[in-house]
Amino acid sequence: MNSCKRFPRSARICLPSEYYVAFEQGRRYSSVLLRLHHLPTSGPVRLGLVVSRRVDIRAVNRNRIKRALREVMRQIAYKLVPGDYVVVVRQTAKDVSNAELSVALLSLLRRIGALPLASIDNAMLPFFERNCSRK
């Protein structure tokens, strides 16, 4: 992947203390595949992912799930309400496709009001491409 299309460090939740705050103070929403903790903030949209070994013992499969969810968030981050979003993947997500994970995350985001009900296009985000030089 081109480095200019990656999640910048400012768009990720990195520290355990930041996860703790989102878990303790944020609102929790659940679906069959995912649990979402949302903490509204005045800063940018930030994403944290939790995929435990209970979901799948193989790291390859856990990383596939994280890549799929990260890609969805990368594409829609500019449409979201500012805040911290921590996605906890449930065991039922082990054998589902990337498309099903995407639909589950989008429906959760719509349900909490963080994403407009309009259709999502696959346009690249200006937020993540602003420092990208095209040749």
Swiss-Prot record:
GO terms for cellular component: ribonuclease P complex. Gene3D superfamilies: 3.30.230.10. Keywords: Endonuclease, Hydrolase, Nuclease, RNA-binding, tRNA processing. It is an enzyme of class 3 (hydrolase). It catalyses: Endonucleolytic cleavage of RNA, removing 5'-extranucleotides from tRNA precursor. One of its GO terms (molecular function) is 3'-tRNA processing endoribonuclease activity. Consists of a catalytic RNA component (M1 or rnpB) and a protein subunit. This is Ribonuclease P protein component. It comes from Xylella fastidiosa (strain Temecula1 / ATCC 700964).
